[in-house]
């Protein structure tokens, strides 16, 4: 008998296949006393080393299949394995308590996990999840238990799991794994983000799928609506095969738009750009018809290594992206480290709230030579294409002036040394701090463009961490207050003859696109896989009508009213 579950649609598409259950292994053990303490310490160190090797291989595969930016998550796990502040106490516990390695590992990590989970800071709570993932891996090697390896799947299946760790998701082979469904998770969870990168259907947060599915059961995953059907009837299979076929035809229609400009029904052109993390991501931008790179996150050049990238290394990376876009615009964001992004070789102060602390441009000003090195590399790369530079986390006009003056100083030095540098580099800022949005009219007199980073702008405006489930209901992209800030920024730029882009998740959201078009946004920068879908939508919209829609939305009281307004319009 068919059973239907409802979850959260995390990645578009339909999958119909037999279930592959990713079951947690039995990692139970007995606490024992050891007599040969040194041998026990060596056994623990051996398990650590095997785990490091294994994780390094997983990271390499993730970088190859998903891109360097998605592989960065494993750097956090490797940092845990290499952290003497964690491994040291475990070894001390073995020596002092004469206990087996399994017990020392469990008890010591329990202490750290409890400490991190009790913190208000979401970033620190995520470190607890990293420790749990690493502990499971090390414990499995101590016990000689094999952790299920999704990379070994060699037949068409849908993966069913309570949750998928980043390690699990990075090993999924797209040729065989047609989709996945989990008990827990949300649209912004790691597993959901990975699913969209892999471009496979996914439904998360069903609460009970693992209790409802047995190995080899036929399962339908509807990543469009968030439905899951176990033991579907022939009629249901036929129905979803039709939806799957229609969706494939829809994607084929979108593919026809690859080489077209993005023009609304009434002839208004906007630019659809892509967010990237490495030069390897360019292939996806080009294959999806990206008109520009709206955000190049340079921090990924600094991650996954044990020292700062040299000027030459940076120059080669920037040159590859700028030249690879063949004259199309490339907006490069200078180093945005701090908050949720750390470097193992850069000591940062411990802060109660790192998202409001020493990060991004603030960190660059305090480490000026680091900043100057990056700017020199960017200036040298500018002659190979259409390079634009923007500074993150700008709160005051003086901060922009300081960053601009450092760049102009480096430009003058390079020219004096005979190095060719473009004279047409546009300089802009990220609008992610409400203070910058409110003062956009003054910034617009000095910058060449704005790029609205909605992920942080929404968090800072609503005072709500979007990864904190207790307050995530306040993370509201459609709240009229957010829309008013966006309009304020766009209007300020246009008054000075400048342009505004958006590089947060909101830019590719199909509910937000009509509103943003009506607000006058010039550039929409999103994940490459969302470009063609968004282009298709915009080509069906009349921009003059969207202006009226946006005006009406600005005068609503709640986010729910705005969504209802857009849905009512798009349904007509």
Curated annotation (Swiss-Prot):
<feature type="binding site">
    <location>
        <position position="333"/>
    </location>
    <ligand>
        <name>phosphoenolpyruvate</name>
    </ligand>
</feature>
<keyword id="KW-0479">Metal-binding</keyword>
<dbReference type="Pfam" id="PF05524">
    <property type="entry name" value="PEP-utilisers_N"/>
</dbReference>
<feature type="binding site">
    <location>
        <position position="432"/>
    </location>
    <ligand>
        <name>Mg(2+)</name>
    </ligand>
</feature>
<keyword id="KW-0808">Transferase</keyword>
<dbReference type="Pfam" id="PF00391">
    <property type="entry name" value="PEP-utilizers"/>
</dbReference>
<keyword id="KW-0762">Sugar transport</keyword>
<protein>
    <recommendedName>
        <fullName>Phosphoenolpyruvate-protein phosphotransferase</fullName>
        <ecNumber>2.7.3.9</ecNumber>
    </recommendedName>
</protein>
<dbReference type="InterPro" id="IPR000121">
    <property type="entry name" value="PEP_util_C"/>
</dbReference>
<dbReference type="InterPro" id="IPR008279">
    <property type="entry name" value="PEP-util_enz_mobile_dom"/>
</dbReference>
<keyword id="KW-0963">Cytoplasm</keyword>
<feature type="binding site">
    <location>
        <position position="456"/>
    </location>
    <ligand>
        <name>Mg(2+)</name>
    </ligand>
</feature>
<keyword id="KW-0460">Magnesium</keyword>
<dbReference type="InterPro" id="IPR018274">
    <property type="entry name" value="PEP_util_AS"/>
</dbReference>
<dbReference type="GO" id="GO:0046872">
    <property type="term" value="F:metal ion binding"/>
</dbReference>
<feature type="binding site">
    <location>
        <position position="297"/>
    </location>
    <ligand>
        <name>phosphoenolpyruvate</name>
    </ligand>
</feature>
<dbReference type="InterPro" id="IPR015813">
    <property type="entry name" value="Pyrv/PenolPyrv_kinase-like_dom"/>
</dbReference>
<dbReference type="GO" id="GO:0016301">
    <property type="term" value="F:kinase activity"/>
</dbReference>
<dbReference type="InterPro" id="IPR024692">
    <property type="entry name" value="PTS_EI"/>
</dbReference>
<dbReference type="InterPro" id="IPR023151">
    <property type="entry name" value="PEP_util_CS"/>
</dbReference>
<comment type="subunit">
    <text>Homodimer.</text>
</comment>
<feature type="binding site">
    <location>
        <position position="466"/>
    </location>
    <ligand>
        <name>phosphoenolpyruvate</name>
    </ligand>
</feature>
<dbReference type="InterPro" id="IPR006318">
    <property type="entry name" value="PTS_EI-like"/>
</dbReference>
<feature type="active site" description="Tele-phosphohistidine intermediate">
    <location>
        <position position="190"/>
    </location>
</feature>
<dbReference type="InterPro" id="IPR050499">
    <property type="entry name" value="PEP-utilizing_PTS_enzyme"/>
</dbReference>
<keyword id="KW-0813">Transport</keyword>
<comment type="similarity">
    <text>Belongs to the PEP-utilizing enzyme family.</text>
</comment>
<dbReference type="GO" id="GO:0008965">
    <property type="term" value="F:phosphoenolpyruvate-protein phosphotransferase activity"/>
</dbReference>
<dbReference type="Pfam" id="PF02896">
    <property type="entry name" value="PEP-utilizers_C"/>
</dbReference>
<dbReference type="InterPro" id="IPR036637">
    <property type="entry name" value="Phosphohistidine_dom_sf"/>
</dbReference>
<dbReference type="InterPro" id="IPR008731">
    <property type="entry name" value="PTS_EIN"/>
</dbReference>
<dbReference type="InterPro" id="IPR040442">
    <property type="entry name" value="Pyrv_kinase-like_dom_sf"/>
</dbReference>
<dbReference type="GO" id="GO:0005737">
    <property type="term" value="C:cytoplasm"/>
</dbReference>
<dbReference type="GO" id="GO:0009401">
    <property type="term" value="P:phosphoenolpyruvate-dependent sugar phosphotransferase system"/>
</dbReference>
<dbReference type="GO" id="GO:0015764">
    <property type="term" value="P:N-acetylglucosamine transport"/>
</dbReference>
<feature type="binding site">
    <location>
        <begin position="455"/>
        <end position="456"/>
    </location>
    <ligand>
        <name>phosphoenolpyruvate</name>
    </ligand>
</feature>
<comment type="function">
    <text>General (non sugar-specific) component of the phosphoenolpyruvate-dependent sugar phosphotransferase system (sugar PTS). This major carbohydrate active-transport system catalyzes the phosphorylation of incoming sugar substrates concomitantly with their translocation across the cell membrane. Enzyme I transfers the phosphoryl group from phosphoenolpyruvate (PEP) to the phosphoryl carrier protein (HPr).</text>
</comment>
<keyword id="KW-0418">Kinase</keyword>
<feature type="active site" description="Proton donor">
    <location>
        <position position="503"/>
    </location>
</feature>
<dbReference type="InterPro" id="IPR036618">
    <property type="entry name" value="PtsI_HPr-bd_sf"/>
</dbReference>
<keyword id="KW-0598">Phosphotransferase system</keyword>
């Amino acid at each position: 008998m068919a059973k239907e579950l409802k979850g959260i649609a995390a990645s578009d598409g339909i999958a119909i296949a037999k279930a592959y259950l990713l079951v947690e292994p039995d990692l139970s053990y007995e606490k024992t006393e050891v007599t040969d303490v040194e041998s026990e310490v060596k056994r623990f160190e051996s398990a650590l080393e095997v785990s490091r090797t294994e994780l390094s291989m997983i990271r390499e595969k993730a970088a190859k299949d998903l891109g360097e930016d998605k592989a960065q998550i494993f750097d956090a796990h490797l940092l845990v394995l290499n952290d003497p502040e964690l491994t040291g106490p475990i070894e001390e516990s073995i020596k002092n308590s004469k206990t087996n390695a399994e017990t020392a590992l469990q008890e010591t990590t329990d202490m750290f996990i409890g400490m991190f989970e009790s913190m208000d800071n979401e970033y620190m709570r995520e470190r607890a999840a990293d420790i749990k993932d690493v502990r499971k891996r090390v414990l499995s090697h101590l016990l000689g238990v094999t952790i299920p390896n999704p990379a070994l799947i060699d037949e068409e299946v849908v993966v069913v799991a309570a949750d998928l760790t980043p390690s699990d998701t990075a090993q999924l082979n797209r040729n065989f794994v047609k989709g996945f469904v989990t008990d827990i998770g949300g649209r912004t969870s790691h597993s959901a983000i990975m699913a969209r990168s892999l471009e496979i259907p996914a439904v998360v947060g069903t609460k009970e799928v693992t209790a409802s599915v047995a190995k080899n059961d036929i399962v339908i995953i509807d990543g469009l609506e968030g439905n899951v059907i176990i033991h579907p009837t022939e009629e249901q299979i036929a129905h979803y095969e039709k939806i799957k076929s229609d969706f494939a035809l829809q994607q084929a229609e979108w593919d026809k738009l690859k080489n077209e400009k993005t023009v609304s029904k009434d002839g208004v052109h906007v630019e659809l750009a892509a967010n990237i993390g490495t030069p390897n991501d360019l292939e996806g931008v080009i294959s999806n018809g990206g008109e520009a790179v709206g955000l190049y996150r340079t921090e990924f050049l600094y991650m996954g290594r044990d020292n700062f990238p040299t000027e030459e290394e940076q120059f080669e990376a920037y040159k590859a992206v700028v030249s690879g876009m063949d004259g199309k615009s490339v907006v490069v964001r200078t180093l945005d480290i701090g908050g949720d992004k750390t470097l193992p070789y850069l000591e940062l102060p411990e802060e109660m709230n790192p998202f409001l602390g020493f990060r991004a441009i603030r960190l660059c000003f305090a480490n000026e030579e680091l900043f100057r090195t990056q700017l020199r590399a960017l200036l040298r790369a500018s002659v190979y294409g259409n390079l634009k530079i923007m500074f993150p986390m700008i709160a005051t006009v003086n901060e922009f002036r300081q960053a601009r003056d450092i760049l102009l100083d480096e430009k003058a030095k390079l020219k004096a040394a005979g190095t060719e540098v473009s004279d047409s580099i546009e300089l802009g800022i990220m609008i992610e701090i409400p203070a910058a949005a409110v003062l956009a009219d003054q910034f617009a007199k000095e910058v060449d463009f704005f790029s609205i980073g909605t992920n942080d702008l929404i968090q800072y405006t609503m005072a709500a961490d979007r990864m904190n489930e207790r307050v995530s209901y306040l993370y509201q992209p459609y709240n009229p207050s957010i829309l008013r800030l966006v309009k304020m920024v766009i209007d300020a730029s246009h008054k000075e003859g400048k342009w505004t882009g958006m590089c947060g998740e909101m830019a590719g959201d199909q509910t937000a696109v009509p509103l943003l078009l009506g607000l006058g946004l010039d550039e929409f920068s999103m994940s490459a896989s969302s470009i063609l879908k968004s282009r298709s939508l915009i080509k069906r919209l009349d921009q003059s009508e969207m202006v009226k829609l946006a005006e009406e939305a600005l005068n609503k009281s709640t986010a729910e009213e705005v969504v209802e307004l857009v849905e009512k319009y798009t349904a007509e």
